């Protein structure tokens, strides 16, 4: 991205995507800004009237009347300014609510929901760029747009004072426009690259924080420091390139401010000396244009805020660009857990397999075969070819959420960050005796009783303070409450005592749940049969010895290869 040419059109595209749905707030803020800018001219115009008329009469009544009108106009400015601030605060709340809702939906409906597996977990750090958008938009609407509008109005009014002022204002606008054109593309691209460098550094620090003490050794510490220095150097270098453009613009605007202020005084003085301009007009022009010139001197700061807004909008657009799965809305889920795969191909794996409803098989799987099958059953991936049926029907005809409620895959030790009570309530709203019996069945009753907060213990994403085996047992207890039609258990369940696992499977058997138990210890349990789940061939056996013979033969073939 650092070398990609980005321009104003790209910036408008990102801003439209992020801010566009809430643009009504921005438009209303701009309307208030227009009114405030027009009313703000009351002061210089009042001064001009004071000098040209009131001073000549030397009477207090016109002075009081003029001051009273000015006070009323300024109080109206105060009221409109307060309303504008209130509207922008509403914009911040509305923007936050909408972005949170949309990102949640896009994450839930992601085509590939395993963000951590693809090293994309840091993608959601982009959410914090929302704060920049929240603060930059009101600042630009209230500050920058006010400056621009007051400049337009002020330059228009003073242009009618004298043709020389008109020419002066045209040159001033041309100079401002040239400063914007010359450095805008480099500044926009540099701001986006700088934001990316910031997130790369944050991703690295996040990985250090999640290393669980891995870097607490001399060799690993050296690597961590070198990597930190590398991401720091990358950020500093990127910031230096961006600052080159932004600083050049800032200096250019400051120079315009200096030359324009001096030039106005020189031109105004010359016109007064020639009798072509009144003193009141010069004072009014100075009051109007001095504010314009000061605003020009602040353009560099506001453009920096604009570039940050563009970069943050680009980062947020990455969340909106998460590929979404095609949602198929049926009106039902599978009738039972029967599974049939006929020449189903996915990513180099081929499956031809049939399971009856309620069957439970001890399964020995080749590396990768179990994971691909799980992706197919949960419809996280679609077959490249072949036919897949669950409950006698094509999974594409089901309500996708009903399907994923009825098909459960437990093959990871990670768990949602919630309390144990909240996690169990995802399966059953009432933590009655059934839930307690499920915990007792998997052997967690005593362990949970030993925790200081019991069921209210907060779980980390790794399951801590529970061990890996205990976390998998908790997930199995959840499955006992859900009673899915089809359940695939990964090899991590080898960590559970066989008698606990057998007891849980008996309960599932009573409810008609089809189970594939992938294990590295097929001799520990005796179920309805045995399955060898290969990448290209699947074979069922009635006897353990036959399964072990095939597994040993393939292991010997792999070793010789």
Regions found by a protein language model. Name each.
Residues 220, 244, 292-322:
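Cytosolic ends of transmembrane helices, especially the final helix of ABC transmembrane type-1 domains
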Residues 33-34, 66-77, 81, 142-193, ...:
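Transmembrane helices of ABC transporter permease
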Residues 26-80, 87, 158-164, 279, ...:
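Transmembrane helix-loop-helix hairpins at lipid-water interfaces of multipass membrane proteins
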Residues 1-42, 56, 60-66, 88, ...:
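Membrane-integrated ABC transporters
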Residues 69-81, 172-175, 249-260, 266, ...:
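Hydrophobic alpha-helical segments in the permease module
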Residues 47, 106-153:
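Juxtamembrane loop-to-helix connectors within ABC transporter transmembrane domains
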Residues 21-24, 112-113, 125-137, 141, ...:
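An intracellular "coupling" helix at the cytosolic face of ABC transporter transmembrane type-1 domains
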Residues 335-338, 421-461:
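ABC ATPase nucleotide-binding domain helical subdomain, centered on the C-loop/LSGGQ "ABC signature"
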């Amino acid at each position: 991205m650092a070398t990609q040419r980005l321009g104003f059109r790209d910036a408008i595209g990102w801003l439209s995507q992020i801010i566009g749905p809430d643009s009504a707030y921005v438009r209303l803020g701009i309307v208030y800004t227009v009114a405030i800018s027009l009313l703000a001219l009351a002061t210089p115009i009042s001064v001009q009237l004071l000098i040209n008329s009131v001073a000549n009469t030397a009477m207090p009544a016109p002075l009081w009347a003029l001051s009273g009108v000015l006070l009323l106009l300024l109080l109206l400015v105060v009221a409109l300014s307060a309303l504008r601030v209130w509207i922008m605060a509403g914009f911040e709340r509305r923007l936050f609510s909408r972005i949170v809702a949309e990102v949640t939906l896009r994450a839930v409906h992601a085509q590939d929901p395993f963000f951590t597996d693809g090293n994309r977990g840091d993608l959601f750090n982009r959410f914090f760029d929302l704060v920049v958008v929240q603060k930059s938009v009101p600042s630009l609407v209230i500050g920058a747009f006010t400056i621009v509008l007051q400049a337009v109005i002020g330059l228009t009014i003073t242009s009618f004072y004298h043709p020389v002022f008109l020419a002066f204002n045209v040159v001033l606008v041309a100079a401002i426009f040239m400063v914007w054109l010359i450095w805008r593309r480099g500044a926009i691209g540099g701001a986006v690259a700088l934001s990316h460098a910031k997130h790369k550094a944050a991703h690295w620090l996040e990985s250090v924080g999640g290393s669980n003490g891995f870097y607490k050794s001399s060799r690993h510490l050296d690597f961590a420091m070198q990597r930190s220095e590398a991401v720091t150097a990358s950020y500093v270098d990127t910031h230096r390139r961006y600052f080159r453009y932004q600083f050049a613009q800032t200096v250019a605007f400051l120079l315009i401010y200096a030359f324009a202020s001096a030039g106005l005084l020189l031109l105004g003085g010359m016109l007064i000396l020639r009798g072509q301009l009144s003193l009141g007009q010069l004072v009014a022009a100075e009051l109007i244009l001095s504010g314009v010139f000061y605003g020009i001197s602040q353009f560099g700061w506001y453009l920096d805020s604009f570039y940050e807004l563009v970069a943050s909008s680009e980062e947020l657009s990455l969340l909106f660009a998460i590929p979404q799965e095609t949602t198929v809305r049926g009106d039902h889920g599978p009738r039972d857990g029967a599974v049939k795969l006929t020449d189903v191909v996915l990513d180099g794996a081929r499956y031809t397999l049939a399971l009856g409803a309620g069957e439970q098989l001890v399964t020995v799987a080749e590396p990768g075969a179990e994971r691909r099958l799980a992706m197919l059953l949960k419809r996280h991936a679609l077959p490249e070819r072949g036919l897949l049926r669950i409950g006698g029907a094509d999974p594409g005809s089901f309500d996708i959420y009903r399907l994923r409620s009825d098909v459960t895959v437990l093959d990871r030790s990670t768990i949602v960050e919630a309390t144990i009570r909240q996690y169990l309530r995802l399966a059953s709203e009432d933590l009655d005796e059934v839930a307690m019996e499920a915990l007792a069945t998997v052997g967690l009753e005593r362990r949970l009783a030993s925790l200081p907060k019991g069921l209210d213990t907060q779980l980390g994403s790794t399951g801590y303070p529970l061990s890996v085996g205990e976390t998998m047992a908790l997930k199995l207890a959840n499955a006992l409450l859900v009673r899915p039609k089809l359940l695939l258990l990964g090899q991590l369940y080898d960590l559970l005592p066989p008698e606990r696992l057998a007891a849980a499977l008996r309960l599932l058997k009573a409810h008609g749940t089809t189970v594939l138990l992938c294990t590295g210890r097929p001799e520990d349990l005796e179920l309805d049969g045995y399955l060898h789940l290969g990448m290209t061939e699947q074979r069922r056996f009635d006897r353990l010895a036959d399964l072990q013979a095939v597994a040993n033969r393939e292991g010997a073939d792999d070793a010789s290869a």
